[in-house]
């Protein structure tokens, strides 16, 4: 993983995914809160997400976030879902721990603390996935199920 030093909001990229120029990805440095579930004011979280987008190269209006429930449900994200969960928790996609899309310009985001974030890319079909893999989801094979969905 390589740190991308941006003055206002550093982030990380995985070397292997960074070699795939047709997609964009990031891992937040945690310098600023991008979760509505913490103690940060919602207006500040939105500003932090917008700033991260400016630094990492995604549009906040195209960000999609799900309501993570530590399960194994997978949601296929469409263009109509763009912006769900970007500006508030109420608009998140319901009860899902993996997001998959082949829509260009959509940014999928999962939030983790002690769970594992998994990012996948299938060059053949042009699909990406972002997975929140907690112990229950891992035991229920959320990663394997997501890989199978990408095929």
Protein language model regions, located:
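Glycine- and Gly-Pro-enriched alpha-helical subdomains that act as flexible
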Residues: 118-151
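RNA-interacting cores
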Residues: 13-16, 20
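Phosphate-centric recognition/catalysis
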Residues: 46-49, 53-131
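Residues that form or immediately flank small-molecule/cofactor binding pockets and catalytic motifs
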Residues: 16, 30, 68-71
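Short, Gly/Pro- and small/polar-rich lid/capping loops
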Residues: 1-13
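Intrinsically disordered, low-complexity, positively charged segments
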Residues: 20-56
């Amino acid at each position: 993983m390589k740190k991308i030093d941006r003055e206002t909001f550093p982030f990380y990229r995985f070397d292997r995914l960074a070699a795939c120029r047709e997609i964009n990805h990031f891992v937040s440095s945690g310098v600023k809160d991008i979760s509505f579930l913490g103690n940060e004011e919602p207006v500040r979280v939105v500003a932090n997400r917008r700033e991260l987008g400016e630094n990492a190269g995604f549009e906040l209006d195209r960000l999609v976030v799900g309501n993570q429930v530590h399960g194994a449900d997978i949601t296929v994200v469409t263009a109509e879902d763009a912006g769900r969960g970007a500006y508030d928790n109420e608009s998140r996609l319901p009860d899902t721990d993996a997001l998959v899309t082949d829509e260009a310009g959509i940014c999928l985001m999962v939030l983790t603390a002690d769970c594992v974030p998994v990012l996948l890319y299938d060059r053949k079909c042009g699909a990406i996935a972002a997975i929140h893999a907690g112990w229950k989801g891992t035991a229920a094979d959320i990663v394997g199920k997501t890989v199978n969905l990408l095929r």
